[in-house]
């Protein structure tokens, strides 16, 4: 029997979690679907764009991601302290980015005066929203529901897009976190969809490598949780993301080395003739 999410997610034990969502019947609803003879690769960009929006709204950082044709991997860091540090105005602004919200919140944002009863009601709502903005289930809900609506609208149909609940796995130490990130980043290679990390579309490793390639450019900021060797946060930044427990070069080398190991239970590996990424 599936366990309640509150029993699976305990940020006191660990703030890091591996989350997986699969399309219904594991159909290729984000790639080439052999049944319908249609290509839905463009939906991967939908998912990535939505993840970026959510990472700017929630107190949840993305450590790694891989968007595949029939499922999605995310390694997330839940920062409850950050959510508690937000002022009420910040919480309201963030929540109204996701939802239209009640009239009292919209009126407050517009600068209209509120009565004492309305102020009390809004204060209660703010604390509810604050908890949700640091909640893993609400993050995945805001991701999956939005993508399902867009896909159903495109297909002119109704019904489920994702299989039931998303799955989550607690990452209890640094070794588990880093190995899971590497596993997620190697998904296209292991599935035989890509030969190199640089060609692994819609993965965090490709994004980190692209960022590293333009490290001397002015436009080199990233929304991903930073590795320890990356540039420090700018003084203007109001929020400091926690740095992941591995250097940039060590992580690149780890993923590259792991991806070259041939596994009998996987279809793909990085070919031996491909030069190391470093």
Cite the ranges covered by each PLM segment:
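Short catalytic/metal-binding and nucleic-acid-binding patches
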Residues: 1-278
